């Protein structure tokens, strides 16, 4: 994994990535945080998504969550990413990749897909967009 991340840093024209105390590597690309962490035989990419409209007080907006999950199912054949709620209830875009099958080019492709999906999802989570999609107008 170290060689993979070293090669990724080189190909992105960056200094070698350094893990934090929890072993998580943090990359900021196009103003988006992409966290990479080894998990057994996998490399997990995670990007938290700021989605205050997903919460209604202490509850989750089920209609919006259902819509987002349906979209995640639709892209599942083309993208390794899925949407998850973390332990704090925050929406996270996540991909799990087998380290044995991963090379630098493949990792870059997955990161690019992560960024593309973020650009697709984030506008849907603005107050106006959410209101029009779930009938809050």
From Swiss-Prot:
Keywords: Cell inner membrane, Cell membrane, Chaperone, Cytoplasm, Membrane, Plasmid
A Pfam family of this chain: CesT
Record localization: Cytoplasm; Cell inner membrane
One biological process term in Gene Ontology: protein secretion by the type III secretion system
Principal location class: cytoplasm
Coiled coil: none
Topology of the protein relative to the lipid bilayer: Peripheral membrane protein
Gene Ontology cellular-component terms listed: cytoplasm; plasma membrane
InterPro entries (alphabetical): T3SS_YscB, Tir_chaperone
Task performed by this protein: Functions as a specific chaperone for YopN. It could facilitate the secretion and the subsequent translocation of YopN.
NCBIfam families tied to this protein: type_III_yscB
Quaternary state and interactors: Interacts with SycN to form a complex which specifically binds to YopN.
Protein name: Chaperone protein YscB
Source organism: Yersinia enterocolitica serotype O:8 / biotype 1B (strain NCTC 13174 / 8081)
Gene that encodes the chain: yscB
């Amino acid at each position: 994994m170290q060689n993979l991340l070293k090669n990724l840093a080189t190909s992105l024209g960056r200094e070698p990535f350094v893990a934090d105390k929890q072993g998580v590597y943090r990359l900021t690309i196009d103003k988006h945080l992409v966290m990479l962490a080894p998990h057994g035989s996998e490399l997990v990419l995670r990007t938290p998504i700021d989605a205050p409209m997903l919460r209604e007080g202490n509850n989750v907006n089920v209609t919006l969550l259902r819509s987002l999950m349906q979209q995640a199912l639709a892209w599942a054949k083309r993208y390794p990413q899925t949407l998850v709620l973390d332990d704090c209830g925050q929406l996270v875009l996540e991909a799990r990749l087998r380290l044995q099958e991963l090379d630098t080019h493949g990792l870059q492709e997955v990161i690019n897909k992560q960024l593309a999906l973020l650009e697709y999802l984030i506008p849907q989570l603005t107050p106006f967009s959410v209101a029009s999609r779930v009938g809050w107008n």
